[in-house]
Swiss-Prot record:
The gene is tmk. SUPFAM superfamilies: P-loop containing nucleoside triphosphate hydrolases. Its EC number is 2.7.4.9. This is Thymidylate kinase. It holds the Pfam family Thymidylate_kin. Belongs to the thymidylate kinase family. It comes from Acinetobacter baumannii (strain SDF).
Length: 199
């Protein structure tokens, strides 16, 4: 089983992933916990490039998208597909839906570009995607409490509003796969809501 976790900054994805990871392990199941961008040594190097705040050069939106997919291709081949072939459960902090929400809805890139990349480099989609949804202001306040903000977290409120709208578009288009979780609830309540979809 392949499960991805999506949402804007500070909505509690990491906390939920840890809880679900523990839940499956207590059932004696083998679980792989991973993230995007990242998940392999090479993909983590790309992640560092993507998140770094570079005052000397602005990263173009196309470059950002291509770097994310370079990391994703490596991640799929090295981690996700081998784990699924071994009948392990894969829990991924973000996957292709993040690219639609952030790069297409947020940045305004063409969906055709994303579709082309998905067709050529993404051979497996999650069976279940949890979208943790909360007001942008709430999530950003939580993100600020964590400390220094990365390149994405420093974006304006209007950007994250578009990202959230992108996630909502996906959720309405694919309600069977994408499950919206109310991230204004406590971590335990979010976990209980998620478990209902995994029963």
């Amino acid at each position: 089983m392949f499960i991805s976790f999506e949402g804007t900054e500070g909505v509690g994805k990491t906390t939920l992933i840890r809880k679900i990871h523990q839940h499956f392990e207590e059932q004696g199941k083998q679980v792989v916990l991973t993230r995007e961008p990242g998940g392999t040594p090479l993909a983590e190097q790309i992640r560092s490039m993507l998140l770094a705040v570079n005052h000397d050069e602005n990263m173009s939106h196309d470059t950002e998208l291509l770097l994310i997919y370079a990391a994703r291709a490596q991640h799929l081949q090295q981690v996700i597909l081998p784990a699924l072939e071994s009948n392990k459960i894969v829990l991924s902090d973000r996957f292709t839906d993040a690219s639609f929400a952030y790069q297409c809805s947020g940045r305004g890139l063409s969906q055709d570009k994303l579709q082309l990349l998905n067709q050529n480099f993404v051979s497996r989609m999650p069976e279940v995607t949890f979208w943790l949804d909360a007001p942008i202001e709430l999530g950003m306040n939580r993100a600020r409490e964590r400390g220094a903000l990365d390149r994405f977290e420093q974006e304006k409120l209007s950007f994250f509003t578009k990202v959230r709208e992108g996630y909502e578009t996906l959720w309405k288009a694919e309600p069977e796969r994408i499950k919206r979780l109310d991230a204004t609830q406590s971590p335990d309540q979010v976990f209980e809501q998620a478990l209902q979809y995994l029963a």
